Amino acid sequence: GKFNNHTSIFETLLSGFPAGTVSGAPKIRAMEIIDELEKNKRKLYAGGIGYFTPNNEFDTCIALRTALIKNNKFYVQAGAGIVADSKPEKEYLETINKAKALMKAVD
């Protein structure tokens, strides 16, 4: 896409986060609910990872499954897509399975 010449490449990228695919809709209310329900801030999880070139080109992706090692502790974040006909138990198991895959990778 193209962006406004009065907007920096970083402002352009940041305007899209958090991505609707991980926040839900309507976005503002969904983000309020996330803040109410989730014990920890998402930080890297659901954020953008990528690179920028001197020619104002960039390529990014969304961090959907993340692991962080800090102070000898291993933190894992994973999620599932909740929609109107989701079964809570199945979504929970999907999240656990995704997290287990991260833990197995470093085992």
Placement of each model-derived feature along the sequence:
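Conserved hydrophobic core element of enzyme catalytic domains
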Residues: 1-107
